[in-house]
Structure formats: structure tokens, C-alpha cells
Amino acid sequence: SEMCIRDRPYNDGKDVSENDYVDVRLDHTLARPNIPFMDVQLYDWTPREASVYGPYSPKKRLVSLNSTYYSPIWPYMNALNFYVIRYADLLLWRAEAAIETGDLETGRKYINMIRERAKNTQHVKTMDQSQDAANYKVGVYDEPFKSKNEAVQALRMERRLEMAHEGIRFFDLVRWGVADEVINAYIAKEKV
């Protein structure tokens, strides 16, 4: 079956191995060690002080160094427009409203619209372009959600994947009433 929240426990806290399936949006959103960074080179996290900042770097809204839109002189700006609201955000708001009012089927429909687009997104390739850089797998929810809780968990994971690095997660956590729980758990783990 295609990978959905049903295939792996939601936010189980376990690291993904190089043989596990991952959502293709992961490698379009952040740079991971040994995965091509844009189309320039393999990402090398060693200059980043991983013990402080972690081994990952954001990729969203960056332009490839090989792009004609990239300015190779200071201040290294590009002409990408800044968006305030994306269409995907609207679809996920609609899904959330439907789920919160008990219409789980409409919520599933809108979540699946996002997942279908992600499923058909171009995969990040190895540097020689011969194969996918990771084991990518994204599926849709073929069967109705079994409960409101399952629908809520699917929606929250979808927002986390789709809207990553866009500066809105905190507001999602506040709206859902879980900001203190999630942030305190994160701080407790990170301070060790």
C-alpha cells in the first residue's frame, strides 16, 4: 500500500533509516546529508555545527546556483515572489473545518488532493540523475477515516509536511490547543 499515516505511527519519534520510505516533500523542503542540494552538490552538513543546529538546512524558497534567476553577487537575492497564503493552505483549512465539524469524508477528500499532488511531484534525483535520491512513497487515503481522531492526526501531519519552513506551525499548534505540550516536549528533548 502507499505510505500514509496508517502505515507508520504518527510522530512516533523514531529516526528514519536510509532504507525507509519517505515523503518526497522532505527532500524538497530541507537539505539532508548525502542527498543532492538543489542540483549543485551533495549536501555536506559538517560546517554547520550539527551538535547545535542539527545536520539539516532549509531548502524551501531557495534558487539553484545553476538557475538564471540566481544572483551570484552580494546580497545573493532572487526574484521569487513571497506568498502569504498558498492554495495548499486553503485546501488544508477546508479539510480542517470539515473534520472539526464532523464531515470526515470531505476532510479526507481535501487531504487527498494535497497528497495526490505530492505523489506526482518530481522526485529529487542522485547527482548523476540516474535514480531517486531516496525511497519516496506518498499515497492517498483510500478508505474513510475510522474516527475523528484519525482524521485530525492525518490533517496535522499533512500540514506539518506541506507547510514546513513557512513560519506557520506555531500558529497551528496554538489553534489546536497543543502549543505548550508540543513545545515543552521539544525543549525537554533538545536540552539533553
Please place each PLM-identified region on the residue numbering:
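Short, small-residue-biased leader/transition segments that mark boundaries at the very start
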Residues: M3-I5
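Acidic/polar-rich alpha-helix caps and helix-coil junctions
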Residues: R8, G13-V192
